């Protein structure tokens, strides 16, 4: 039996909150992907919880996103909604906040960047990107992975 939440005001928005409300351990939560409708694996449930993404509701049922759809729709989002890129110092002056106080997600896997990852952008002179009204960069895992991928050539 899947959990159903009729009242939008009472809907848990995070996996941790859903786990508490249903009194089910995180490992036993069974959720479907909002895009492909496949059931998430345990690893995907944990990954979703670690990225601090919010649950979405369709017909009063909670949905998350699987890894394949997350990577695919993150790329679509990047291409459709990219606005501009800035260096860390410029981002701080634009927002009037320090980088450590800003929520900056990885543009690829959507995990929140740690203070160390934000500092690495500054040290390596890598830019942050405004995509769909949110600031993004690269987490260390995606940074390493994309540095191994062949670059697109321009002809």
From Swiss-Prot:
A zinc finger (unnamed) spans 33-69, 106-142. Pfam families: E6. GO terms for molecular function: DNA binding; zinc ion binding. The keyword ATP-binding does not apply. Keywords: Activator, DNA-binding, Early protein, Host cytoplasm, Host nucleus, Host-virus interaction, Inhibition of host innate immune response by virus, Metal-binding, Modulation of host cell apoptosis by virus, Transcription, Transcription regulation, Viral immunoevasion, Zinc, Zinc-finger. GO terms for biological process: DNA-templated transcription; regulation of DNA-templated transcription; symbiont-mediated perturbation of host apoptosis; symbiont-mediated perturbation of host ubiquitin-like protein modification; symbiont-mediated suppression of host innate immune response; symbiont-mediated suppression of host type I interferon-mediated signaling pathway. One of its GO terms (cellular component) is host cell cytoplasm. InterPro entries: E6 (IPR001334), E6_sf (IPR038575). It is found in: Host cytoplasm; Host nucleus. Its main location: host cell. The keyword DNA-binding applies. Forms homodimers. Interacts with ubiquitin-protein ligase UBE3A/E6-AP; this interaction stimulates UBE3A ubiquitin activity. Interacts with host TP53 and EP300; this interaction inhibits TP53 activity. This protein has transforming activity in vitro. Plays a major role in the induction and maintenance of cellular transformation. E6 associates with host UBE3A/E6-AP ubiquitin-protein ligase and modulates its activity. Sequesters tumor suppressor TP53 in the host cytoplasm and modulates its activity by interacting with host EP300 that results in the reduction of TP53 acetylation and activation. In turn, apoptosis induced by DNA damage is inhibited. E6 also protects host keratinocytes from apoptosis by mediating the degradation of host BAK1. May also inhibit host immune response. Belongs to the papillomaviridae E6 protein family. Belongs to the low risk human alphapapillomavirus family. The cancer-causing human papillomavirus E6 protein has a unique carboxy terminal PDZ domain containing substrate but low risk E6s do not possess this domain. This is Protein E6. It comes from Human papillomavirus 56.
